[in-house]
Amino acid sequence: EAVIRMADGGEMRLSLFDDEAPITVNNFVFLANQGFYDGTTFHRVLADFMAQGGDPAGTGSGGPGYTFEDELDTGFSFDRRGLLAMANAGPGTNGSQFFITFVATPHLDGLHTIFGELIEGDDVLSGLTLRDPDTATEPGDVIDEIVIVER
C-alpha cells in the first residue's frame, strides 16, 4: 500500500497491484522511498477526468531521468473512479508521473498502466484544487510525502 500525505493534512491510501504491474509498482515504491515525490504537486487536476502528480518540475514535463515500458496486460480497465495509473507521453515513456481517475475513462484502456486503486481518502481526492497547467498561475496542491506501507 501507499499513503499520499498532503501538505494540508489529508491522506489518500492506495492499494498497489504489485502482482499485475510489478515493474511499475517497483518504480513507484523506489521513488517514494527515495523521497522523490516529497514536495511535488498535483499539477494537473481536471474535472470529470483525473488528478495528475509526480512531476518534480510541476509542469507536466518532468520526470526521474529515465523511462520504462508499459504493463498493459494487467486485467484492469479504466472502468471506475479511484484508479492509480502512470501518465506518459506515448508507449514506453513512463517515468514518475501518475494520475488517479475521478470517473471511468475507458478511452485510456491500453494506453496507460493501471497499478493501484484508492481505498481510503476519497474526500481528499474530491477536494483537490482543479488546475489546468496551461492556464494556472498558482501551484497545485502539495504532496508532503508518499509513504509505502509493507503488507
Locate the predicted segments by residue.
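Cyclophilin-like peptidyl-prolyl cis-trans isomerases
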Residues: 1-151
